[in-house]
Amino acid sequence: MKVKAFANQVHIAPRKARLVVDLIRGKQIKEAEAILMFTSKSASPIISKLLKSAVSNAVHNFKLDENNLYVEEIFVNESLRLPRLFPRAKG
């Protein structure tokens, strides 16, 4: 059974977050948490929080055992960009 968790509108570059996500793809939950704890990247706490949310969803909503869970699929896409406006004379 697939359990999903989302983190929308996170203020970090997708390229930086993908470096961390690639480390935990396909790993057991305990191993992924250990990797995230000792990875000194700015995306690590964000991904760790997301992983804990997914585990909570699995345990609480679907009554799954936490020891049998692993990261099957995890990915990072680009979010919306903030519009930047530079007010000045245009003529």
Swiss-Prot record:
GO terms for biological process: translation. One of its GO terms (cellular component) is cytosolic large ribosomal subunit. NCBIfam families: rplV_bact. This protein binds specifically to 23S rRNA; its binding is stimulated by other ribosomal proteins, e.g. L4, L17, and L20. It is important during the early stages of 50S assembly. It makes multiple contacts with different domains of the 23S rRNA in the assembled 50S subunit and ribosome. The globular domain of the protein is located near the polypeptide exit tunnel on the outside of the subunit, while an extended beta-hairpin is found that lines the wall of the exit tunnel in the center of the 70S ribosome. Part of the 50S ribosomal subunit. One of its GO terms (molecular function) is structural constituent of ribosome. It comes from Loofah witches'-broom phytoplasma. This is Large ribosomal subunit protein uL22. Keywords: Ribonucleoprotein, Ribosomal protein, RNA-binding, rRNA-binding. The lineage of its organism: Bacteria, Bacillati, Mycoplasmatota, Mollicutes, Acholeplasmatales. Belongs to the universal ribosomal protein uL22 family. InterPro entries: Ribosomal_uL22, Ribosomal_uL22_bac/chlpt-type, Ribosomal_uL22_bac/org-type, Ribosomal_uL22_sf. The gene is rplV.
